[in-house]
């Protein structure tokens, strides 16, 4: 078995992709931002947890903003200029992530809500009593 330290590391290849899709998955606990090419191959990704936010701080709009900013900058290194945004989930970081992607310099051409809606599927979790 090859040692992790001695294993040859793959170099990141700079792809020239003009347009892409930003998938924002916003849950109650975290926000994940993945930027793909039009075929769905990942170009860049980031999440609130991967940036060092822990616990309840991951679910804040600020954490979502930082995650979107990091993914946007990484995608721009690959030559990306315009993106469509697909938002999924009920979390608090949805709008903050979209605004942050626009602020990095990426042109947002469309915003879609792709939150899955059950056709009376499984029973939802019980209501919280705080």
UniProtKB/Swiss-Prot annotation:
Oligomeric form and interacting partners: Part of the 30S ribosomal subunit. Interacts with proteins S7 and S18. Binds to IF-3.
Gene that encodes it: rpsK
NCBIfam families documented for this protein: PRK05309.1, uS11_bact
Pfam families, per the entry: Ribosomal_S11
Keyword tags: Ribonucleoprotein, Ribosomal protein, RNA-binding, rRNA-binding
Name of the protein described by the UniProt record: Small ribosomal subunit protein uS11
Family to which this protein belongs: Belongs to the universal ribosomal protein uS11 family.
Gene Ontology terms: biological process: translation
GO cellular component, one term: ribosome
GO molecular function, one term: structural constituent of ribosome
Ribosomal protein listed as a keyword: yes
Organism: Latilactobacillus sakei subsp. sakei (strain 23K)
Record PANTHER family: 40S RIBOSOMAL PROTEIN S14/30S RIBOSOMAL PROTEIN S11
InterPro entries, sorted: Ribosomal_uS11 (IPR001971), Ribosomal_uS11_bac-type (IPR019981), Ribosomal_uS11_CS (IPR018102), Ribosomal_uS11_sf (IPR036967)
Gene3D superfamilies: Ribosomal protein S11 (3.30.420.80)
Summary of the function given for this chain in its UniProt record: Located on the platform of the 30S subunit, it bridges several disparate RNA helices of the 16S rRNA. Forms part of the Shine-Dalgarno cleft in the 70S ribosome.
């Amino acid at each position: 078995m090859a040692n992790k330290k001695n294993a040859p590391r793959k170099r990141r290849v700079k792809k020239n992709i003009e347009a892409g899709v930003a998938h924002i998955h916003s849950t109650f606990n975290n926000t994940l931002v993945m930027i793909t090419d039009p075929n769905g191959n990942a170009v860049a990704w980031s999440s609130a947890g991967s940036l060092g936010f822990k616990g309840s701080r991951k679910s804040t709009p600020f954490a979502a903003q930082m995650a979107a900013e990091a993914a946007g900058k990484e995608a721009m290194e690959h030559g990306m200029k315009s993106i469509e945004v697909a938002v999924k989930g009920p979390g608090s970081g949805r709008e903050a992530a979209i605004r942050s992607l626009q602020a990095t310099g990426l042109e947002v051409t469309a915003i879609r809500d792709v939150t899955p809606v059950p056709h009376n599927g499984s029973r939802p979790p019980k209501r919280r009593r705080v």
